[in-house]
């Protein structure tokens, strides 16, 4: 529970908002933990896409009070023996969100603190664990926090939403079920990391930033620094070995000039990205995640 005593659940799912599924989950959260603040992270992620969901939840501790419970779910294996996992992570203290990349804007201060994630044990927490590590992890099996006979087609409600509310209300994390060893926590295979060699940066498109159609890569700002690249450096970006963009690295979209002009920038998560000014890039060209990216100084 946050230090101010007001419980918070940040809720992400693939349930959509065209029926009452999310409302059922939130109603139960409120019934179990009256007064809880529920923040909707995203309910429109691609159904069953564990890797996409992982990207939406990894940065959340930077922006939430200590003690927040992150209820995160896409449950392709609903109704099977796949259980949920609840773990505590420790967010390190940090200053401004993007260091030198924050320009002249003031950063923010975040004291270190612990947070709880609950998710299906299907790899959804892969990136969270990689980024933050964890202090303790448990299988969610105690019938004090989940139904004795959970609805098999709705584990997102039964095995994530309901126990998240019990945790937000103060139920001890170490009593939700047995402790899990590290090798029992499922991870998905991560793509090969970006590389820097001889001034050439190589990476991939990790995802499309919907609904804007921007292309995000796995080339981090630290990779750019290693290659001596900063804002206004003229770059040549080769996409999938076919499309070439000769552009400077700039802070934001409007620096591209005209509406529709392409732009290379650092996204809010600290990674190199490619877009068009106030227009989609991915959709007109049918560009997808997984395409290769090569960057050099022009």
UniProtKB/Swiss-Prot annotation:
Residue numbers binding S-adenosyl-L-methionine: 14, 19-21, 75, 156, 209, 214, 268-269, 276-278
Catalytic activity of the protein: fluoride + S-adenosyl-L-methionine = 5'-deoxy-5'-fluoroadenosine + L-methionine
Keyword Glycoprotein: no
Alphabetic keyword roster: S-adenosyl-L-methionine, Transferase
Matching Gene3D superfamilies: Bacterial fluorinating enzyme like, S-adenosyl-l-methionine hydroxide adenosyltransferase, N-terminal
InterPro entries: Fluorinase, SAM_HAT_C, SAM_HAT_N, SAM_OH_AdoTrfase, SAM_OH_AdoTrfase_C_sf, SAM_OH_AdoTrfase_N_sf
EC number(s) from the headed UniProt entry: 2.5.1.63
Record's keyword annotation contains Nucleus: no
Pfam families tied to this protein: SAM_HAT_C (PF20257), SAM_HAT_N (PF01887)
GO function terms (MF aspect): adenosyl-fluoride synthase activity
Organism superkingdom: Bacteria
NCBIfam families registered for this protein in UniProt: fluorinase (TIGR04507)
Protein family membership: Belongs to the SAM hydrolase / SAM-dependent halogenase family.
Its biological purpose: Catalyzes the formation of a C-F bond by combining S-adenosyl-L-methionine (SAM) and fluoride to generate 5'-fluoro-5'-deoxyadenosine (5'-FDA) and L-methionine.
Protein name: Fluorinase
Gene name tied to this protein: flA3
């Amino acid at each position: 529970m946050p230090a101010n005593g007001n419980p918070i659940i940040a809720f992400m799912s693939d349930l959509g908002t065209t029926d009452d599924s999310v409302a059922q989950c939130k109603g139960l959260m409120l019934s179990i933990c009256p007064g809880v603040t529920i923040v909707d992270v995203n309910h429109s992620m691609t159904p069953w896409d564990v890797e996409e969901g992982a990207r939406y939840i990894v940065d959340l501790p930077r922006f939430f009070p200590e003690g927040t419970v992150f209820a995160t779910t896409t449950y392709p294996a609903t109704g099977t023996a796949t259980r949920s996992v609840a773990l505590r992570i420790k967010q390190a203290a940090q200053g401004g969100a993007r260091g030198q990349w924050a320009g002249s804007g003031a950063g923010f201060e975040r004291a270190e603190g612990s947070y709880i994630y609950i998710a299906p044990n299907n790899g959804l927490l892969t990136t969270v664990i990689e980024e933050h590590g964890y202090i303790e992890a448990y299988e969610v099996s105690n019938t004090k926090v989940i139904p004795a006979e959970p609805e098999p087609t709705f584990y997102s409600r039964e095995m994530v939403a309901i126990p998240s509310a019990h945790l937000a209300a103060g139920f001890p994390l170490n009593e939700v079920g047995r402790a899990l060893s590290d090798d029992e926590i499922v991870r998905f295979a991560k793509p090969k990391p970006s590389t820097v060699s001889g001034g050439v940066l190589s990476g991939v498109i990790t995802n499309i930033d919907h609904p804007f159609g921007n292309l995000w890569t796995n080339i981090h700002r630290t990779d750019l620094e290693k290659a001596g690249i900063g804002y206004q450096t003229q770059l040549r970006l080769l996409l999938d070995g076919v499309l070439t963009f000769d552009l400077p690295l700039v802070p934001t979209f409007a620096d591209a000039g005209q509406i529709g002009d392409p732009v290379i920038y650092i996204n809010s998560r600290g990674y190199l990205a490619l877009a068009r000014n106030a227009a989609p890039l991915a959709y007109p060209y049918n560009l997808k995640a997984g395409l290769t990216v090569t960057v050099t100084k022009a």
